[in-house]
A protein has these predicted regions:
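Conserved alpha/beta-domain cores
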Residues: 1-165
Length: 165
């Protein structure tokens, strides 16, 4: 067992034992990692990978096209990247404003099925974090749910760190 497997297996085992079958999954954040590292983790059974940058992800996707992987965009999404995000990702976890929704819906190829989206909510009103205000989340959810090529799957939020807890 190599070092990667030694770190990965206990994590996956703990996840499986803590949740009913299929109730929780692991998205391995592969941003800044080379395609070879993604391939190595895929060989251990990991299928979902998270990327921050559309262009970096597209290069990896081309290099790893022979693998059946699920790609998540976890970084901020600019409107000029919606076309590539809608066409090449399975999930966009960082929808933080209404302007992105019709762009993603329009650019999603019908043959790929609906694009899974998470609405990013800035729950602590941190200036350094992206996300819509909590009070705007329901209106954003209603807009997302009305679009046929998007599948609203939930929320994504990163709470403010509390080192004393």
């Amino acid at each position: 067992m190599d070092a990667l497997e030694a770190r990965y297996r206990p994590l996956v085992d703990a996840l499986r034992s803590a949740s009913p079958a299929g109730a929780a999954g692991l998205v391995a954040v592969s941003k800044t990692q080379p395609a070879g590292a993604v391939r190595a983790l895929a060989a251990l059974g990991q299928r979902a990978f998270g990327e921050n940058y559309v262009q970096e992800a597209l290069a990896k996707q081309r290099e790893l096209a022979d693998l059946d992987l699920e790609w998540h965009l976890i970084g901020p999404l600019q409107s000029n990247k919606c076309r590539e995000a809608a066409r090449h990702f399975d999930w966009v976890q960082s929808v933080d404003r209404a302007k992105l929704l019709p762009l993603l819906d329009r650019e999603r190829p019908a043959e790929r099925g609906p694009l899974n989206v998470l609405l990013q909510v800035n729950i602590d009103d941190e200036p350094s974090k992206s996300g819509c205000a909590p009070g705007d989340a329901m209106a954003l959810a209603d807009e997302a749910a009305a679009l046929p090529r998007l599948r609203l799957r939930g929320l994504m939020a990163i709470p403010e760190p509390h080192p004393d807890e």
